[in-house]
Amino acid sequence: MMDFLKRFFGSSQERILKRFQKLVEEVNACDEKFSSLSDDELREKTPQLKQRYQDGESLDKLLPEAYGVVKNVCRRLAGTPVEVSGYHQQWDMVPYDVQILGAIAMHKGFITEMQTGEGKTLTAVMPLYLNALTGKPVHLVTVNDYLAQRDCEWVGSVLRWLGLTTGVLVSGSPPEKRKAIYQCDVVYGTASEFGFDYLRDNSIATRKEEQVGRGFYFAIIDEIDSVLIDEARTPLIISGPGEKHNPVYFELKDRVAELVYFQREMCNHIAIEARKVLDPFLGTDVLPKDKKVMEAISEACRALWLVSKGMPLNRVLRRVREHPDLRAMIDKWDVFYHAEQNKEECLEKLSSLYIVVDEHNNDFELTDKGMLQWIEKIGGAAEDFVMMDMGHEYALIEEDATLSPADKLNRKIAVSEKDTQRKARAHGLRQLLRAHLLMEKDIDYIVRDDQIVIIDEHTGRPQPGRRFSEGLHQAIEAKEHVTIRKESQTFATVTLQNFFRLYEKLAGMTGTAITESREFKEIYSLYVLQVPTFKPCLRIDHNDAFYMTEREKYQAIVAEIISAHRSGKPILIGTESVEVSEKLSRILRQNRINHTVLNAKNHAQEAEIIAGAGKVGAVTVATNMAGRGTDIKLDEEAVAAGGLYVIGTSRHQSRRIDRQLRGRCARLGDPGAAKFFLSFEDRLMRLFASPKLNTLIRHFRPPEGEAMSDPMFDRLIETAQKRVEGRNYTIRKHTLEYDDVMNKQRQTIYAFRNDVLHAEDLFVVAKEQIEHVALALAFLILKDAHADHCSLPKIEEWLSYSFPVKLDDQEIRRLGDVDAVADYIGDLLIEAFDVKFSAMLAEFTEIIGSAANAQGICNDILRSVIISHIDEEWKVHLVDMDLLRSEVGLRSVGQKDPLIEFKNESFLLFEGLIRDIRIAIVKHLFALELSLTRSDRPDNAIPTVATAFHNHDNFRPMELTIVGEEEES
C-alpha cells in the first residue's frame, strides 16, 4: 500500500524537492533581471534588502532576490583572481540549479546531502548571505582550521563583494581579535573554537568587556554528521591543573606492567601448548574424523577460547582462527560458556586468568587470582581492592566513649582522608590496567615530543591539547614512560549536542547523512534532504573482496595496487589506523612502489599530499583523515587513465566513513572506482559479525589466496555495521539524557553569572543575595526550633561569627513565620552591609576625589567577589556531578533507574550549590577588608589616579588590599 502511495504521490523527499524547484526558477529569474545592473547598483541591493527586512519582510520573501544577487555576483567574478592560502586562484564557480536547491533547503533548516565535488562550499554562501541580512550572528562551522581559513578567503570573497564583513576563527586567535571577528556579519570557524569561546565567555570572563561572542542565530555545519554524531560523545572541556598531583600512576606503573606481563606469559604458554596439538591440521582443509583426535582438537580450542579472554590479540590465537573449522570450534566454546547452565564452569575456567578482557564491550575484570598475585608476588596491598564502609566507620567513632567531640571530629576527618586516598589508588590502578589492556599505541594515540597525543577514531587526525579524562591520560603516560602530568580539573564543559541547540536556526551539509537521518530527527529535529547530483556519478563500485586471513588480504591489496599502478591510475588507499598505514607502507616499500603516507604523524603536510594525490601514477596511503573536506582533483592524464582508484583496507564500524572514502573519487562526472578488501580477522568482523559467519565461511571457503564475493557477505557486513551504529547511537542518546540535566543547571548558572557581569549596580545584586541567605537562615532556625533538640544557640553563634549581627531570640519566637523571620534577619544584614560599604565608599571618595570613580571601584570589587564564588563553587559542583554520574550506574543492581536517580540527586546537589554560592558570597562581603593607601607621589598625581581607576588599567598609584575570611582565620 505504501509503495502504491509513493508511486502515486511521490516520496516526501520528491515532494520537497518539487516545491523547492519553483523557488529555483524564481532565483534564476532574479539573476537574469540583475544582469542589467551595474556593479554599484548590484552592491546597493544589500542595504536595500536589509532595510526591507527591518521594515517587516520575511527572509523567505527576500530569498529569491538574495540568492539571485549571489548568483549574479558569482557570474561577474568569473575569471578574477582570489588569493587563497597564499596562492592566486581564478574564480570559476557559478551556482548550478542543484546548488540553489541545496541552499534553499539549508535556509529552511534541512541537512542537505550533496555528493563529493558537488560544491557544498559555494552552496552555503547563499543562505549565509540571506541570514546575515538580519544583522544577527551567522556562523559557518567547518571540521578544521585549514578549511575555515580557505572557505573564508575563497567563497567569502562573494560576501565581501556585496558589502558584508567576514571573519575566521582559528586556534591561537587572541581574545582582542576574537571580539572583532565576532562582530563580522559572517564568521567561519570550527565547532571547538565556537564552543570554547562560549565556555570562556560564561566561565572565564570576569568583565563584560572580556566576552567576545554576540549570540547564536544561524549556523551551517559543514560535514554535520562528523560534528554532531562522530564527536557528540566528546564534550568540550576547559580545564586547568588540579590542585594536587596524584602520585599513584608513578608508584604503580611498574607493578601493573608486571601483572600484565604475567598475564601475557600465561596466555602465551597456553596458546603454545594448544598449537602443538593443532599444528598438523593448520595446513589442511578437512579435520580428521578420529574421535580421540577430535577430542584433543576440541580441548585445544577450548584452551584458545580461554586465551581469547585473556589476550584477544594473541598471535597463535589469530593464526589458528585462520582455519575456518578451528575458528568455528573456538566460537562454539564461546557459545557453550554463554549458556546459563554453564555459567559456573565458565567462571571456574576464567578464574585461572589474572585478568579477564572483554574486547567486545571494551572492559576488563581482575580475577581473585589476579588480586592474589598483586598482593603476594607484586607487592600491592589488599586495601587496593577493599573500599571503606564510611557509615560503619563513623558509627564506631561515635560509639567510642573515650573520645571527646573534638577528637571524634578529627578522627572522622582522618578516616575520610584515608577513604579518599584509597579510592584514588584503586581508581589509578584500574586506569593503568585499562591503558595496558585496551588502549593501543598508533591506534588510539601516538607518542610525540614526550607527550601522548590522542588520535580521533573517526578522522584519523591527531588531537593535540585534548586529554583522556578521569586519569586515563596519566595512565597512558605512565605506560609509555613519558612525563606524567597533573590531572586536570574541569572549569567548564558542554557537549556539542547541547552547544548547537543554542542556535535559533541550524542547518548542515555533508555527503553522508541519510544513514543517520533517524538520529538527526530525534535528537536535533533536523531532517535530511538528498540533493540530486549535477552530473551522473561515473564511479564504479566493485564488490567487496573477502579473504580468510589478514595476510591474504594484504597480498591481494598489493597485487591490486601494482596492477592499477601500471595503468597510471592515481590510487588512494584508505586505512583505519596509523598502525595499518605504516604496515602497508612497509609492504609497498618492499615492493618498490613509490608512495606517500598521510596519517596523524605527518598531518601538517595534508594539503600538499592531497594536492598531489590526483596526479597520474600517484599512490597515497592515508588514514580516515583524507576522507573529509578534501577534494582530490585529477590532472588530464589521470582522467584518461580511468580516474582515481580508491582501495579500502577494511570496513569501518560506520557506513558513513566507508561512503566518505568512496566519495573521494568520481567527483563532478570524473571517472573513478572503489573497492574494499576485507578479511575475517578484521576487528568489525571479529567483534560484531553475525553468529552465522562460521557457517558461511565453511560453506564458501576458497583455496588459499582467492577472494570470496557474494551478496550474502555484503549483507553480513551491513548487519554488523548497523549493530555497531545502533550501539553507538544508544550511547550518544544516553550521554545526552544525562547532559540534558547538566545543561539546565549550566544555563541557570551562566545566566546568573552574566547578570552579574552586565549589572550596573552591584549593590542591588549583593542585597538580593543577602535576602536569599536570610530566607535560608529563617527556614533553618524555624525548622530547628520545632525539633526535639533545639540548637538555636549554635546557629546564632555561627551567625554572629560570620556576620556582624546578633539575633533576638524573643523577637524570632514572636514572629514565628518564615517570611517574617527572613525579613527580620534580612533587614539586620542589609543594615550592616550598608554601614560597612557606605563607610568604604566615603573613604574611597575622599582619597580619589570622585564619587563616580569610587562607586565604580566598589562595583568592580563586588562583581569580583560574586563572580569568584560562582566559579569556585561551580568547579566543585562539576566534580560532584561527575562522581554522582559514575556512582548511579550501580543503582540498576537494586532495580532502580540510574537516570531517574541521577535527576533526583543532581537536583538536590544543585539546590545545595545555589545555597553554598549565596552563603559564600555574603560571608565574603562581610569578611572583606579594603583599604586604599596613597602612593608616594605628589598631589598632582591624583587626577591620574582617578583616570586609572576609571579605566581599570594597570593599577599603579594606589594599592588595593583585599582580605578574605581565609586570611583572617
UniProtKB/Swiss-Prot annotation:
GO terms for molecular function: ATP binding; protein-exporting ATPase activity. Gene3D superfamilies: Helical scaffold and wing domains of SecA, P-loop containing nucleotide triphosphate hydrolases, SecA, preprotein cross-linking domain. GO terms for cellular component: cell envelope Sec protein transport complex; cytosol; plasma membrane. The keyword ATP-binding applies. It is found in: Cell inner membrane; Cytoplasm. It catalyses: ATP + H2O + cellular proteinSide 1 = ADP + phosphate + cellular proteinSide 2. Keywords: ATP-binding, Cell inner membrane, Cell membrane, Cytoplasm, Membrane, Nucleotide-binding, Protein transport, Translocase, Translocation, Transport. It is an enzyme of class 7 (translocase). It is a peripheral membrane protein. Pfam families: P-loop_SecA, SecA_DEAD, SecA_PP_bind, SecA_SW. ATP binds at Q99, G117, E118, G119, K120, T121, D631. Signal peptide: none annotated. Monomer and homodimer. Part of the essential Sec protein translocation apparatus which comprises SecA, SecYEG and auxiliary proteins SecDF. Other proteins may also be involved. Part of the Sec protein translocase complex. Interacts with the SecYEG preprotein conducting channel. Has a central role in coupling the hydrolysis of ATP to the transfer of proteins into and across the cell membrane, serving as an ATP-driven molecular motor driving the stepwise translocation of polypeptide chains across the membrane. This is Protein translocase subunit SecA. The lineage of its organism: Bacteria, Pseudomonadati, Chlamydiota, Chlamydiia, Chlamydiales.
